[in-house]
């Protein structure tokens, strides 16, 4: 992925996205029938597992992740060809953050000469690593519990029943009958991506004028896209202001 310096995310910022992620695309390469490499892609929910020492690095306030980058854990149908064929080289998980269309009509620059075009803003993290397939039912079950718990808690947080009673109902793997769970476990395999490299990109208008970023924020808020608006207010607007001030300083020195 092409990442200009002003759009690049640090490893710590990438990990922050992984800890909140829902799902992402597992991308692998396999030998086709004629030996030609063929990509394969499956969209999966993932659980981020920090590497050893990551918590200590976070407490120290470091900008990078210490003690290893950790891993992503997920599950695939046992009959999925993606896990039945040998993988060539490393695998990648593509994580999609927020994204949205940017219309010129929302930007003050549109009314100040019209030198503006539409674009698409987005946040993404490409997670590279070595993929391991796990066939042990105990490993698969142990990896399902935290994944299910996290997403159940996230889902329950928006449940009107919880807002009314103070506690929304949630589901746990152990709620299901054991024979049913055993049958389900036989139908899947576990996949673990041991992370070797993170590439993060936030193309979120940091290179625009502060006025244009403010226009985008207003447009997002008007459409109820509050999380995207908050990101641009907290990250993009300060970056745009720093860029504006730097360019103004350089002009003054000429």
Regions found by a protein language model. Give the residues of each.
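Beta-strand secondary-structure signal
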Residues: 73, 92, 128, 190-194
